[in-house]
Amino acid sequence: MMATFYSSAQAMTKTKLAVVGLFLLIVGGAAAAEDQNKIFTARAEKEFHRAQAQFQSATNDSTNAWQFARACFDFSELVTNATQRADSARLGIAACRQLLVREPKSAPAHYYLAMNFGELADAEAPSITAYKLVHEIEREFKTAAELDEHFDFAGPVRNLGQLYFQAPGWPLSVGSKHKTREWLERAATLAPDYPENQLCLAEAQLKWRQRDEAEKTLKKLAAIWPAAQTNFTGVAWEKSWGEWRVRRTAAQAEFQKLFPAAP
């Protein structure tokens, strides 16, 4: 997020996709990585069009609106064309804003407004507009957290933590170690059985060289892993599991590198 001022979700997602892509290159070659990305992108595009049609059939339906905004985000984060990414994000932003006129206290609308702001910032970076969007993202995630901190497995809380973790610190941006710790620990407490929350916290702790804290979080991740594999299943979770497995392996390797066991 240093030069392009990605949103929390965008910066995190781009990092994860890069790691997963590298893993696929190692174990299966470039063709495997490309094929996998094409599959995920095709699925996201199909869902985008389905959700768009559903939304257009009843634009005053609240669920239709935020689910379309979610589909806009999911599609935007996978496409490689910046113009296409920005266009999809703007559609998501418009759907959220339209919903918020009617329901200003809609947590999903504030949440996906922040997510799509992140995609728009990524598409337009580097620019002053992208830089300014960071504060919009922060505000919308905070509002979503105030309205429903449990939404999307503590998504608003987790993504605030990731925003503060990925962003440069003051005076350049909103980055803050203290706020990162506060929000990521809170997300891990609110939805402890969701792998993403434990992974985000562990990755931050490893960056800060916090041995005891990272060890505790990685043990918690190991404890919830078997149940998570049965709770988060199906096509919709394939991409997440591909990323989670690679990130868990990387976190374990980083822990061993930073804190080698005594001979």
Where are these regions (language model features)?
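Short, solvent-exposed mixed-charge patches
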Residues: 261-263
